[in-house]
């Protein structure tokens, strides 16, 4: 386990646009933490010509707002977690758990590995309305695929600060697709997951409606970093 951390796994929960990925990226600036974005791992599979065709077919539906099947989530996430732990790092999951059944599946996995008491769950809480606003205004780099979180200042940018590529609106961030994502991944569906984790583990809730830097400070406080 990473030095000075009481956790082996940190799970970031939040509806689309909550900023959970951004917060995980900020923590990952510490080399002892590995950011596991299932969304990015899925996109990597989608662009890999050697990937399982069946897996790629399911990922095509994900682009339309549908959920990825549980087996594929487990397959990708469990492998990434084990690789991080082998290296003595803290595994930070972003976007992996989208249903109550998946939450139970992950909990069973953690219990089998004997690390259930070493898992922290951080909920980045925002409203469905704010989710819609943020998602329709965030951009992605056409070159390095860096996702630029929404802010009035960021929305005006056209060039990626990371690599100089062109910033575009994501294909799956168009209004009709976003609305479907909120209908299937919004607070109505997240609430039972959060309540489940309150019963079985360590859950911390942070107000995600504030600025990125303020949320980052709160996350570090609750994780005692």
What spans do the regions from the language model cover?
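Post-Walker A helix-loop "phosphate-sensing" segment adjacent to the P-loop in P-loop NTPases
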Residues: 28-37
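NTP-dependent small-molecule kinase module
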Residues: 2-5, 166-225
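P-loop (Walker A) phosphate-binding loop of NTP-binding proteins
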Residues: 15
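Conserved phosphate-donor/acceptor-positioning beta-strand/loop module used by diverse small-molecule
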Residues: 94, 114-138, 149-162
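ATP-dependent small-molecule kinase phosphotransfer cores
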Residues: 38-113, 130-132, 170
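Cys/His-coordinated zinc-binding microdomains
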Residues: 145, 164-167
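Conserved lysine of the Walker
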Residues: 20
């Amino acid at each position: 386990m990473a030095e000075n951390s009481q956790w082996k796994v940190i799970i970031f929960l939040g509806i689309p646009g909550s900023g959970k990925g951004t917060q995980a990226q900020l923590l990952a600036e510490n080399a002892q933490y590995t950011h596991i974005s299932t969304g990015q791992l899925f996109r990597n599979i989608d662009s890999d010509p050697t990937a399982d065709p069946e897996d790629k077919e399911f990922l095509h539906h994900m682009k339309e707002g549908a959920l990825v099947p549980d087996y594929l989530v487990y397959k990708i996430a469990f492998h990434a977690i084990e690789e991080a732990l082998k290296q003595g790092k803290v595994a930070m999951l972003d976007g992996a758990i989208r249903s109550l059944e998946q939450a139970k599946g992950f909990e069973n996995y953690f219990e089998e590995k004997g690390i259930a008491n070493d898992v922290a769950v951080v909920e980045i809480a925002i409203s469905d309305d704010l989710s819609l606003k943020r998602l329709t205004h965030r951009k992605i780099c056409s070159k390095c695929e860096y996702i630029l979180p929404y802010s009035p200042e960021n929305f005006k940018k056209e060039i990626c600060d990371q690599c100089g590529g062109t910033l575009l609106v994501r294909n799956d961030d168009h209004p009709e697709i976003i609305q479907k994502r909120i209908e299937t991944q919004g607070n109505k569906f997240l609430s039972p997951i959060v309540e489940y984790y309150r019963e079985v583990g360590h859950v911390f809730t942070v107000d995600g409606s504030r600025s990125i830097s303020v949320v980052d400070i709160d996350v570090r406080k609750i994780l005692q970093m």
